[in-house]
Amino acid sequence: MFKRILVPTDGSELTAKAVAAAIDLAKAVGASVYTLSVKEPFPYSAISEMQPVPPQEFFDAQERIAAERVNIVRTACKAAALACEAHTIEAVHPWEAIIEHAKTNGCDLIVMSSHGRSGVTALLLGSETQKVLTHSTIPVLVVR
């Protein structure tokens, strides 16, 4: 069955459902949990004087937020007596980072939440979950 389950987190309420499902599944099959929070890169501007936040402040804030997100998952895993490996990385395209992280860590399942978009909104905006589903060779469990 599954040995290593990756559950990416963006800190949302919907992601919390995916985390709970990943923990339940990991307990049932004896798997370990990996969690990942993807940080946004700094939005450099051609007009450097117009930056709303200095780059270092931006990076520090992104790291703090990402660390808080993975620590929530780590704490939930600890409460369930599960091993959890937590990582934060920076990427332009979170879906690519999620797939690459799963491959690099030998994960055999990715658990993600569906953000519930439908119709034209889903078509125009897409979602990281949809992109992972489309491009991943690793099985993906989508929690709604």
Q: Where in the sequence are the language-model features?
A:
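A short acidic, glycine-rich active-site loop
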Residues: P54-E68
